């Protein structure tokens, strides 16, 4: 099991987080703490998003998807959002990275 020592958020993740309300930020931070303590918690994706994990959590009774990747001891937070167009936008963003 990998021990995470550092968290890096993508510019997209930072922009998305700025738009949230206080309660949504608390829910997101709680989800990040879960991932930090157990990096293999999310579902591993295949195909174009191979290596990316998706963790699902609730915020204001809406399901939110959080895309992340663990490389060695670093947790990379890529994006989060509702299921609508999430994978398409994530694939487009990661293709440009």
Please state what every model-predicted region is.
Residues 33-60:
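A short, surface-exposed loop/turn module that caps and links secondary-structure elements
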Residues 1-31:
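Arg/Lys-rich, positively charged N-terminal/basic patches that mediate binding to nucleic acids
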Residues 2-6, 59-65, 69-97:
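Enriched for short, Lys/Arg-rich terminal
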Residues 2, 15, 39-44, 81:
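Residue-level signal for pocket-adjacent positions within structured domains
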Residues 16, 31-34, 89, 93:
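Residues that form generic nucleotide/phosphate-binding pockets
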């Amino acid at each position: 099991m990998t021990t995470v020592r550092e968290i890096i958020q993508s510019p997209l993740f930072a922009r998305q987080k700025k738009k949230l309300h206080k309660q949504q930020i608390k829910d997101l931070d709680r989800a990040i703490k879960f991932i930090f303590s157990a990096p293999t918690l999310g579902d591993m994706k295949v195909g174009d998003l191979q290596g990316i994990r998706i963790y699902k959590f609730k915020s204001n009774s809406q399901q939110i998807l959080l895309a992340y990747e663990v490389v060695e001891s670093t947790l990379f937070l890529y994006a989060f959002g509702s299921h609508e167009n999430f994978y398409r936008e994530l694939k487009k963003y990661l293709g440009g990275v």
